[in-house]
Amino acid sequence: MRTAEIREKFLSFFEGKGHLRLPSFSLIPEDDPSLLFTSAGMAPLKPYFLGAKPIFGGREWRRVTTCQECLRVGDIENVGRTSRHNTYFEMLGNFSFGDYFKKEAILWAWEFLTEHLRLDPGRLWVTVFEDDDEAYEIWRDLVGVPEERIGRFGEDENYWPGGAITHGPNGPSGPCSEIFYDRGPAYGTPDETGPNTGSGDRFVEIWNLVFTQYDRQGPIPGPGILKPLPQKNIDTGMGLYRVAAILQDVEDFYRTDTFFPIIQEVARMSGRPYEGKTSVSHRVIADHVRAVVAALSDGATFSNTGRGYVIRRLLRRALRHGYLLGLSDPFLHRLAPLVAELLGDFYPEMRENLPAVEKQIRLEEERFLETLEGGLKRLDALLSGLKPGEVLPGKEAFRLYDTYGFPLDLTVEIAAERGYGVDTEGFQKAMEEQQSRSRAAMAFEREIFKKGAQVLEELYAERGATEFLGYNALEAEAEVLALLAGDQSLLEAGPGTEVQVVLDKTPFYAEGGGQIGDFGLLEWPGGRARVETTRKTERGIFLHKARVEEGVLRVGERVRAVVDPRRRDTERNHTATHLLHAALRAVLGPHVRQAGSLVAPDRLRFDFTHPEPLKPEELERVELLVNRWIMADFPVTWRYMPLEEARKEGAMALFGEKYGEVVRVVRVEGSPLEGLESKELCGGCHVRRTGEIGAFLIRSEEAVSAGVRRIEAVTGEEAIRFARGSLNRLKALAERLEVGEAALEERLEKLLAELKEKEREVESLKARLVQAALGGGGGASLEEKGGLRWTVAELPGLDAKALRQAADDLVARGADVALVLSGGQAVLKLSPKAQGMGLEAGALFRALAEKAGGRGGGKGALAQGGGLDPRKAREALPGLLP
């Protein structure tokens, strides 16, 4: 049974049980900074497990089913080395928000597996939490699973989150029941007698049913108290690829129909069959290219931090394994269309965004292969500093791996060719230290249900989300509902206290969509607090970070909330950002997509997908288009509409962003260019007419990462100040060069030409100095040993470039081995004849350094370094020649 058929059978089955089928949510979590990527099927549905009403399509649905794409990188080093680990996977799930519970979840799971997938009931085993008698009895009495195939386990195996009772976290939790498939003795080990025993792969977990019925409270770590939840939920997860491997009767998911075509293509491209030791590299490439294509298709971009660093690491690991297969040129981008072909029917964004994704991957590959070349040079330098028989330290091998992406096995192979060993134990220790740091930093998966302050939960249950008034007003009267300081809820806050203030309604915009959070004042009789920024919770409760300056602020106080008037500048910049986006697409093409933004009062920053720097004329056209929009003074309107209607009208959505059923569409009613319009889904603050922006000037354009560019610009008074400052600097420069501003460019070109001429004269003088020194001897007489002519020359005052030139000249004059010294520097050059007699510059220099002090290295005909004692070097060199 093909993977696509299994996926459809599952979703159709639960639709028949009254579930709403939802499309997969983005891999990029929406409004959940605790997650780098969507890592579980339930992650996007977290608010509904915590009590939010599950409204979809205008009605409430208590039953939902999904096939969710997920990405996890916690065990990345095991990917490819085992048949159980992968990064990008699809999780089938059925969910109940306070509707059905254990009985239905268990009976439906059994029905689907045995009647619809036709799995042999005799090969299905189940496990339950040791204290969950209810689940045990359902399996035994209602389903009919024999007692010997029902295992009872503790909180580490059959409670979610694992170990939560003893170790936390606090919050919703519950027992779980897992379903395993017995693949037979051929897949196992003698000690494997059932699920969670032994070390083999005989018993494969295919489905986990989580019964979220308790609120865990208490010390962490320490024995927790399990309080029954008012709303009991069901959260299940079935690994699509594990089930596919069973139904397709293949040994692991790498041979299923969504993986194996990629592995076959890698084998074809490399000429290395999928077998033996190299099969690890085939699997790594197949897994990682799927993950990279999926993440980029959902809006991620390569970077040095956060999720961008994760996908960069995946791409580089795949490239390293390609290198081991002999693929030394960019090749991953050529696999992207195959990934889109295999997965694009269910994830259409992969096909829609394929051209941009291919381009990003190609650029990132080219950049990294240059880095890999740097790793080769670094490894050569490290090995050159070792004595014969020495071992490369593990920390250095790991630094090569971590900085240059240089795989350990490649380091071992190259070192062995040169006669050196590698401290692999030290490498593993350094790796484990980094993984420990990584696990500590990325403990978010365990905290997926981490609870906010109880007061916020109670406020939301009682009043709902904060009412936002800021689209139409910068001031409002409001009531203080709560004061929070850290984890504490306060009744009042005095002068100097920093608190998070919750109001019943607010004109303050909460940070989001690239726009910074509003700042300003809260005023009340006898008191004042300064709001530094504003954010909001997942549930839409606005948190005003404020410091009390005068008086005492109390819960229940009526305050006047006043947004700083600079918000108007923020509005100018936000509308200008929309115009910039449209202008970039008009000038550069429809491949341009927003990849990030910052909208502040004093500037705007816009990141967008484009493979190369903008030409000056392109920047000029973009800037002119935006200013024509401004001068036309078109109205700016916004209205709410269903998401599908907005898409049909052509409203631009953020690349990879997921939206609710009803969205706000911001539109500029007019255009300076036929066929060009600005219409975007946006919750931010905007001017009422484009003329309010005043003016728009681009300050800079630069690269952010491979395939992503950044423009910074200013509007309004900031644009005037920027223009005036630029003119003043131009005038000052012209005065300093004693020319008129109109003649400034001509004067600079003349100065640059004169500078180049002087540089040529300096180089000529250096060459003459070298010739004079050599002609004057410099100790550079030629001597002979074993048919090789050698010389040592001391030439004071030369830089490294001149030293190399001197060595070249000596070889051209007949020397086979030329050592040139200047101050603390040294260059060694060999003739083809010397190389033909078995000499290698790096090895000869290291041998010389052992006798004359100093360090250095090289390869082939050239080596360089420093610290050699000239007298000792002159005495030692002939003894090192054949």
Curated annotation (Swiss-Prot):
Residue stretches of biased makeup (Gly residues): 854-868
One GO biological process term: alanyl-tRNA aminoacylation
Listed name of the protein: Alanine--tRNA ligase
Cofactor(s), by name: Zn(2+)
Family: Belongs to the class-II aminoacyl-tRNA synthetase family.
GO cellular component, one term: cytosol
InterPro entries in the cross-refs: aa-tRNA-synth_II/BPL/LPL, Ala-tRNA-lgiase_IIc, Ala-tRNA-ligase_IIc_anticod-bd, Ala-tRNA-synth_IIc_core, Ala-tRNA-synth_IIc_N, Ala-tRNA_ligase, Ala_tRNA_ligase_euk/bac, DHHA1_dom
Cofactor descriptive note: Binds 1 zinc ion per subunit.
Chain residue ranges for the region called Disordered: 853-882
SUPFAM superfamilies linked: Class II aaRS and biotin synthetases, Putative anticodon-binding domain of alanyl-tRNA synthetase (AlaRS), ThrRS/AlaRS common domain, Translation proteins
Keywords recorded for this protein, A-Z: Aminoacyl-tRNA synthetase, ATP-binding, Cytoplasm, Ligase, Metal-binding, Nucleotide-binding, Protein biosynthesis, RNA-binding, tRNA-binding, Zinc
Keyword field contains Cytoplasm: yes
Compartment annotation: Cytoplasm
The organism's place on the tree of life at top rank: Bacteria
Record-linked Pfam families: DHHA1, tRNA-synt_2c, tRNA_SAD
Chain positions recorded as Zn(2+) binding sites: 574, 578, 682, 686
Domain notes: Consists of three domains; the N-terminal catalytic domain, the editing domain and the C-terminal C-Ala domain. The editing domain removes incorrectly charged amino acids, while the C-Ala domain, along with tRNA(Ala), serves as a bridge to cooperatively bring together the editing and aminoacylation centers thus stimulating deacylation of misacylated tRNAs.
Gene Ontology molecular function terms on file: alanine-tRNA ligase activity; aminoacyl-tRNA deacylase activity; ATP binding; tRNA binding; zinc ion binding
Functional note: Catalyzes the attachment of alanine to tRNA(Ala) in a two-step reaction: alanine is first activated by ATP to form Ala-AMP and then transferred to the acceptor end of tRNA(Ala). Also edits incorrectly charged Ser-tRNA(Ala) and Gly-tRNA(Ala) via its editing domain.
Lineage of origin: Bacteria, Thermotogati, Deinococcota, Deinococci, Thermales
EC number from the UniProt entry: 6.1.1.7
The reaction(s) this protein catalyses: tRNA(Ala) + L-alanine + ATP = L-alanyl-tRNA(Ala) + AMP + diphosphate
Gene3D superfamilies: 2.40.30.130, 3.10.310.40, 3.30.54.20, 6.10.250.550, Bira Bifunctional Protein, Domain 2, Threonyl-trna Synthetase, Chain A, domain 2
